[in-house]
Each structure stands twice: as structure tokens, then as C-alpha cells.
A protein has these predicted regions:
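Phosphate/NTP-binding elements of NTP-utilizing enzymes
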Residues: 2-189
Length: 189
């Protein structure tokens, strides 16, 4: 039996508001609405995001949804290099989209990024190194900053090398990245 097609988009089943198309805002709304359980600091970050969408302009803040989407979409061009997901495209989870999108989507009125640093705390084996490697590669080649420099720092060289090694493997798995990034001893340029 053929399904009827409606010329207008369906209403949001949760009410009259149209569901946000931006994954950053959708995640923030889900947290604030209690659809996703989160800690106090995550809830506050999501509340801040939603409030700043309304009144951020008065404080000199601009939401650049296209920049957020560009950063999030970049990760789809990367591949996992180890573990059960090896070889699969890197699809960001909602919380990861919120982090990456917030970092690159929020700008000051002078169009410079609002956030220069981020503190992300998650349990072991939850993809911190992969997320950081992808973010580093984005900053290196896709953020549009001429002559960008990206550093991997940690308390030990071995720890810093984990993120570098992950980025290196991501480059090796992508012919598009290989054409833009050259590996030298302990460097990706």
C-alpha cells in the first residue's frame, strides 16, 4: 500500500516547535528537556548554548551554524584506525557533536572563535584520543587558518604520542588527507 505524501513537513511530535536542524542545538535541547540524562555541568553548558542563541548577540556573540556543521561533517571523512570500528567512518555521537560544534560554531562579533580551550572529561575508552586527533586535523587543514600549528601535549611524551599516532593513522587511511598533509619525523605538516 502506497504511503500518502504530505506537502508540508510533519509537526514535531513533542509540540508545535519545529525540531532544530542543528545537531548542537538538538543535543542541547534534549539535555535541557530531560530526554538525555546528563550531569550538572553538561546541563549548564546546554542551557548556556540555548540562552546565547536568544540573547548572545547583545553580548557580542554570534552563532555560526555553518561553521559548526562544517567541523562536525569533517569527522565523516575520517576513519577509525583501531579496535572494533577500524576502517569505519568516524560518526560523532551527540555529545561529541555538541563539543565540536560549540568550539567552532560560537564566535565573537569580530568573527574570531569564542572558545579557545575546552575541558572534556570522559571515562577511559570513550574515544577521547580519536576525538582530539580529529579535532587537531580539522584545525590543521580545514579551519581556514593560514599556517595553522597544532600541538599534542600531555604529562609524558608517550601520552602525547597517543593522539599524534591516532592522527597519523587517520591521515594514512585517507587519500584526501594524504594529499594535503606531509609526515616528517614526529610532525604532520
Amino acid at each position: 500500500m502506497a504511503e500518502k505524501r504530505n506537502s508540508r513537513p510533519p509537526r514535531n511530535p513533542g509540540g508545535g516547535r519545529k525540531a532544530p536542524s542543528c545537531p548542537v542545538t538538538a543535543y542541547a535541547r534534549a539535555i535541557v528537556d530531560g530526554k538525555i540524562v546528563a550531569g550538572r555541568l553538561v546541563r549548564l553548558a546546554c542551557e548556556r548554548h540555548l540562552a546565547d542563541l536568544k540573547v548572545g548577540v547583545k553580548r557580542g556573540l554570534v552563532w555560526d551554524g555553518a561553521a559548526a556543521r562544517h567541523a562536525i561533517d569533517f569527522f565523516g571523512h575520517l576513519r577509525h584506525s583501531t579496535g572494533e570500528w577500524a576502517g569505519e567512518p568516524f560518526v560523532l555521537q551527540g555529545w561529541q557533536q555538541f563539543v565540536v560544534g560549540s568550539l567552532y560554531g560560537w564566535k565573537r562579533k569580530d568573527r574570531l572563535r569564542r572558545f579557545r580551550t575546552a575541558y572534556v572529561e570522559v571515562a577511559r575508552k570513550n574515544g577521547k584520543s580519536v576525538l582530539l586527533a580529529g579535532t587537531a586535523l580539522y584545525a590543521l587543514i580545514a579551519d581556514g587558518e593560514p599556517g595553522a600549528h597544532v600541538y599534542s601535549a600531555a604529562t609524558t611524551r608517550d601520552q602525547a604520542r597517543i593522539v599524534f599516532g591516532e592522527a597519523e593513522r587517520m591521515v594514512a587511511a585517507s587519500s584526501a588527507l594524504q594529499s594535503r598533509i606531509t609526515r616528517t619525523v614526529n610532525n604532520l605538516a
